[in-house]
Amino acid sequence: WAGIGLGKGTVQELVTKIRRNRKAMQHWLCTDLLVIDEISMMTAELLDKLNGIGKKLRANQQPFGGMQVLFVGDFYQLPPVYKNGEQTVFAFESAAWAEAIHENMELTIIQRQKDVVFQAILKEARLGSLSKQSCEIIHAREGLDWKQNKILPTLLFPRRSEVDMINE
């Protein structure tokens, strides 16, 4: 959508890149509401760049060039992706966030999980503090042959190198 790839370069370099891409330019000029999902994975640096790009391309000094913005995500889940061991700053710590976001909402009702015990385990995991009972429930699942299940599990890895190995 944005036409900036990984967002490397200065705001001006990215603006120049977008101006050469008719489709991306149309996105920036015709969008009234910009929705960014999984905002927890975006760095403060990239969010600030998007804000600057919006202002320049739309010739409007309001946040994001006057677009409304809706950020969706859970900062307890996935942090920004770190490159080369560099720790990055969360999007909510950016200048763009301070400038643009005036209201935060928290959704508190779990819609996709009906198992109350599993909900409790997920809440503990989200907060980084599993009880002994939750650990026992999880450990009881160890050794089960997940390949027998008709629903294949999502595989999660803590390191990019492990993800790259699986994706090869």
Q: What is the predicted function of each stretch?
A:
Residues 1-168:
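Conserved ATP-binding/catalytic motifs of P-loop helicase motor domains
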